[in-house]
């Protein structure tokens, strides 16, 4: 068979000649890649913005699209800015630092609109706060390269780790902790025994959890504990055979005037100020009264349940992790709320009997990225007046909302929640009303 001429080399075993070419960027993907076309084929270009002409290197070829990396911007967009972080080009933590913040929000809003195009929604509202130094939690990898101890995040589209000097989206306190930890790692001989570290800031202070791949000596552990005390952080060790660390220290944060305790390895929203705004908006949209019985699904340690309990007649929180349910019960007790009940249940399975006995009037759910599709058949049988859906994955929210609409609900309000500025992550809140 003759080879075709005038076309890009065909893919073979994922290996092909890498080539560089000029492209005119027409759009932007949900993960912040520029969209161009070459001979009718779509090209996704890392680091390119709409309206730009760039010189890009095609690094991956597929049947439906190719992937490329910007090498030089020939005609620059007026929306382009110099990234504040020196590691932006390599680090996979942020995707949008080269785009002015208002246009970041606009891009996410347009993407949400595309995801919800079948739902007949109105305008998408915006809930936002400051765009830097917001992240109160982070997980970083530790490794040794060329005899140098390094720490950082995964590189873009790679399993490689980028060694970073600091991270500007961390809270200012955690930025200081990060710098101190990096210096300590350079002085330590334990780097080869450390898999990763987790940084956390809450109302009790800053903490570091070190995940060990191999055991360390009592002397080394003692030296690290002395260092942690001098730096002013709480230090936890997680051995390779431990799934959960033990801690006598109380970790907590405030929301809606309530004290929420949690285990340092359990889920909490990483953006504290946006979490406060999100809960306030949820209470305003759902507007529970003493006449309401509210069901809070995937309730965690009570982030929504407890504010709901301050307003509703009765609240029932359901969570899959027993450890988080225990904290939720403790939080209800510590905040003197006796009209809220928590149960542990797998929400991918038939509803527990206690749910079937309740005449639920309103529902709030905040599921993982996979959504809540398995529970929706049960949910619509409750016939709640309103359903407030908080989502970290717009595609599964759109899927679940389609089911709810087909079963008697209409979309009342939708909001983009800017939990992760400088990144391509878009969180959403949707209120559905029963017809």
Curated annotation (Swiss-Prot):
Keywords: 4Fe-4S, Iron, Iron-sulfur, Metal-binding, Methyltransferase, rRNA processing, S-adenosyl-L-methionine, Transferase
Coiled-coil portions: none
GO biological process, one term: rRNA base methylation
InterPro entries xrefs: 23S_rRNA_MeTrfase_RlmD, MeTrfase_TrmA_AS, NA-bd_OB-fold, SAM-dependent_MTases_sf, TRAM_dom, U5_MeTrfase_fam
EC number: 2.1.1.190
Active site: 392
Positions annotated to bind S-adenosyl-L-methionine: 269, 298, 303, 319, 346, 366
Pfam families, per the entry: TRAM, tRNA_U5-meth_tr
Domain TRAM: 10-72
Tagged with keyword Zinc-finger: no
GO molecular function: 4 iron, 4 sulfur cluster binding; iron ion binding; RNA binding; rRNA (uridine-C5-)-methyltransferase activity
Recorded catalytic activity of this chain's protein: uridine(1939) in 23S rRNA + S-adenosyl-L-methionine = 5-methyluridine(1939) in 23S rRNA + S-adenosyl-L-homocysteine + H(+)
Residues the entry annotates as binding [4Fe-4S] cluster: 85, 91, 94, 167
Top-level taxon of origin: Bacteria
Family label: Belongs to the class I-like SAM-binding methyltransferase superfamily. RNA M5U methyltransferase family. RlmD subfamily.
Record's function text: Catalyzes the formation of 5-methyl-uridine at position 1939 (m5U1939) in 23S rRNA.
NCBIfam families: PRK13168.1 (NF009639), rumA (TIGR00479)
Stated name of the protein: 23S rRNA (uracil(1939)-C(5))-methyltransferase RlmD
Origin species: Marinomonas mediterranea (strain ATCC 700492 / JCM 21426 / NBRC 103028 / MMB-1)
């Amino acid at each position: 068979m003759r080879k075709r001429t005038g076309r890009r080399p065909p893919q073979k075993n994922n290996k092909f000649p890498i080539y560089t070419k000029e492209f005119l960027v027409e759009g932007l993907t949900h993960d912040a890649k520029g969209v161009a076309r070459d001979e009718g084929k779509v090209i996704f270009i890392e680091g390119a913005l709409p309206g730009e002409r760039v010189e890009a290197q095609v690094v991956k070829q597929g049947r439906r699209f190719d992937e490329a990396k910007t090498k030089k911007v020939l005609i620059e967009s007026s929306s382009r800015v110099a990234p504040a972080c020196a590691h932006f080009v390599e680090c996979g933590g942020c995707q949008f630092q080269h785009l002015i913040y208002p246009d970041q929000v606009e891009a996410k809003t347009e993407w949400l609109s595309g995801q919800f195009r079948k739902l007949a929604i109105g305008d998408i509202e915006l809930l936002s706060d400051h765009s830097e130094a917001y992240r109160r939690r982070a997980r970083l990898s530790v490794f040794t390269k060329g005899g140098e101890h390094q720490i950082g995040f995964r590189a873009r589209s790679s399993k490689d780790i980028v060694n970073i000097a600091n991270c500007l989206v961390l809270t200012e306190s955690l930025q200081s902790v990060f710098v101190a930890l990096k210096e300590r790692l350079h002085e330590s001989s334990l780097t080869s025994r450390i898999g990763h570290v987790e940084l956390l800031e809450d109302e009790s202070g800053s903490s570091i959890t070190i995940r060990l791949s191999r055991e360390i000596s009592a002397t080394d552990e003692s030296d690290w504990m002395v260092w942690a005390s001098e730096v002013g952080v709480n230090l936890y060790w997680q051995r390779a055979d431990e799934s959960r660390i033990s801690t006598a220290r109380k970790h907590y944060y405030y929301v809606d005037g309530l004290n929420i305790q949690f285990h340092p390895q359990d889920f909490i929203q990483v953006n504290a100020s946006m979490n406060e705004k999100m809960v306030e908006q949820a209470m305003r949209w759902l507007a529970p009264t003493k006449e309401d019985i509210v069901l809070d699904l995937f309730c965690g340690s009570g982030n929504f349940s407890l504010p709901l309990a301050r307003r509703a007649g009765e609240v029932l929180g359901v969570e899959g992790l027993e450890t988080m349910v225990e904290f939720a019960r403790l939080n209800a007790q510590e905040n003197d709320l006796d009209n809220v009940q928590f149960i542990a249940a797998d929400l991918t399975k038939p509803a527990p009997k206690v749910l079937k006995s309740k005449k639920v009037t309103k529902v709030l759910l905040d599921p993982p990225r996979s959504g809540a599709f398995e529970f929706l058949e049960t949910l619509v049988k409750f016939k709640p007046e309103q359903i407030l859906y908080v989502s970290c994955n717009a595609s599964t929210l759109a899927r679940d909302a389609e089911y709810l609409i087909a079963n008697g609900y209409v979309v009342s309000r939708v909001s983009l929640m800017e939990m992760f500025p400088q990144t391509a992550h878009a969180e959403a809140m949707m209120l559905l009303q029963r017809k």
